């Protein structure tokens, strides 16, 4: 097999193409580059780089942000459906926080489409109107993330209660084996909840600044966005390629 064939048929390339064949996989890739460009534009400006260098990075960031908005057109309907389905969840706290999260994200994405219309110049809003749209979009995104963090905090509490109960020894060997399996399941669930809460906490900084609740600089926001983009990419990579594929990555 030639060197070219080895490269083209390499398992890692196949996994990457499988990852990029999904809308989420492409979005996480674009988002990673977008926030990296955001950080680099801030870094180069602070370092005293030329205006052309900084502007190129800002243009890259803006182009990717606009492209991602186009990819999200109509996605608010998914969140409205998810909010409706969340009403069937038995645990009231999980149900209410899920509804709040999905409605927050859905409302954010509706305003996100208006931002795309303005950015693509398909329709131009006045400077005051687009500023208001952007600020309200950030508020709704922040609302969705806040409900997600509340849900994560509650799930952490429930899992700790389950973990304490699962640590008690059982009377029979069969029950003891079941207990060990349950312990592993709880630990896996805890890891997932902690991972999501870390991602949400970092993402929270971005709309909190956009909504003017915080005043963080572009460098911090760029790094926070890059970190959560890579975390989201990891989750999607595992979903597409499985844990073995994630380990290879």
Task: Please describe what each predicted stretch is.
Residues 1-199, 205-227, 233-249:
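Glycine-rich, hydrophobic membrane-spanning regions of integral membrane proteins that mediate transport
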